[in-house]
Amino acid sequence: MSSLSCGTAVCVVCLEKPKYRCPACRVPYCSLPCFRKHKAPPLQQLPVCPLRLGACCCFIEQCRPAAGPVEKKIRSALTAKTKKPVENEGSLDDDDSVADFLNSDEEEDRVSLQNLKNLGESAALRSLLLNPHLRQLMVDLDQADDKAKLMRACMQEPLFVEFADCCLSIVEPSQNEDP
């Protein structure tokens, strides 16, 4: 898999060379047992997500459980490996080092870390996500075998269209503004 060919990518569980990425949070893992360990809740009590989303699937920072010792070790190692020397501090974009690591399949589809943070902090998006019907649509879409077909069906739902428009207005504000 070309997106994991980067030399700094390691499995979040065992630190081996990864072959896959978690579909929810995009962290690399090498095998099904490692994926199951990654998805399994730790033995200690997890914080309750106010939106009742899974720990891995919740993009709101406050809802995520604390990282385990292996994940902290990986993050610090990746930060050290992907940090570039700063010559012009104003010209270095924090997203560059992360982008090198993630190597998504389509460059144009990549959402910057700042935009992801903006999504997580959006009050309008949070209020939409309180709707149980929308949350069920999201779960169904995540679990669907034919995601493209279900996405077309979801885009016929006014609530889902409102959700998509809200996300796009945050991620691509200049393209959604009226002249």
Curated annotation (Swiss-Prot):
Zn(2+) 1 binds at C11, C14, C30, C34. Zn(2+) 2 binds at C22, C25, H38, C49. The keyword Plastid does not apply. GO terms for molecular function: zinc ion binding. InterPro entries: BCD1 (IPR051639), Znf_HIT (IPR007529), ZNHIT3_C (IPR048371). It comes from the Eukaryota. SUPFAM superfamilies: HIT/MYND zinc finger-like (SSF144232). One of its GO terms (cellular component) is nucleus. The modification Phosphoserine is found at S104. Thyroid receptor interacting proteins (TRIPs) specifically interact with the ligand binding domain of the thyroid receptor (TR). Requires the presence of thyroid hormone for its interaction. Interacts with NUFIP1. Interacts (via HIT-type zinc finger) with the RUVBL1/RUVBL2 complex in the presence of ADP. This is Zinc finger HIT domain-containing protein 3. It comes from Bos taurus. The gene is ZNHIT3.
